[in-house]
């Protein structure tokens, strides 16, 4: 896809701060530090539109980015390893659930899992939750460049089995730009 414009629009700490639903939205979800922000930057061919960090839990709000004035990319806070108080973690969970459950313009959820590990219980729980609410979901295995060539298919098969997928997850590496087009082709159902 040709990107003509990509801009940060708004951060939301509560549902009443979400933009008025008007154009399709694609949400990016996954555990803390799995590469959500990196994937968004890669898809948009930008280095710093979405802030990335090696520190888990950096994204603490729901961030909306308008793409080509046609749709939003929505960067959700990560779950799992963030070193935050449990009350903050529960607040994030309620915020994410409210967004995923109620957002009428949500067209797809990109669930990003770390290709180096089997999916976590939280990855499985989110996938089950999305299936229950009949939300379209696209599974992307991140950090594929961190695996040896011989490990890639084994890890992808494990992710497919653990998440009960019909098809193999798409691969992403911030170092290899060739895989972006395949992800783009699957973003808008």
Where are these regions (language model features)?
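Residue-level signal for inorganic ion chemistry
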Residues: 65, 142, 183
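Hydrophobic aliphatic residues
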Residues: 43-47, 100, 163, 187
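Conserved nucleotide-sensing/catalytic segment adjacent to the nucleotide-binding pocket
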Residues: 68-107
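Canonical P-loop GTPase G-domain recognition
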Residues: 3-16, 146-189
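Amphipathic alpha-helical transducer elements in NTP-driven molecular machines
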Residues: 89-93, 120, 177-180
């Amino acid at each position: 896809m040709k990107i003509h414009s990509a801009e940060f629009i708004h951060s939301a700490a509560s549902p009443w701060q979400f933009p008025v639903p008007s154009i399709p939205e694609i949400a990016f979800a996954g555990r803390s530090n799995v590469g959500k922000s990196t994937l968004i930057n890669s898809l948009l061919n930008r280095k710093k539109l979405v802030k990335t960090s090696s520190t888990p839990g950096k994204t603490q709000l729901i961030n909306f980015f308008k793409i080509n004035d046609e749709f939003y990319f929505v960067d959700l806070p990560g779950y799992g390893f963030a070193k935050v108080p449990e009350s903050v973690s529960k607040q994030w969970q309620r915020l994410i659930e409210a967004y995923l459950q109620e957002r009428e313009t949500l067209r797809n959820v990109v669930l990003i899992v770390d290709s180096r590990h089997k999916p976590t219980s939280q990855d499985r729980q989110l996938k089950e939750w999305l299936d229950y609410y009949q939300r379209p979901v696209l599974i992307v295995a991140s950090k594929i460049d961190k695996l040896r060539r011989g490990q890639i298919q084994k890890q992808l098969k494990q992710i497919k089995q653990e998440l009960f997928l019909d098809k193999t997850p798409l691969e992403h590496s911030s170092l290899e730009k060739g895989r972006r087009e395949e992800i783009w082709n699957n973003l808008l159902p």
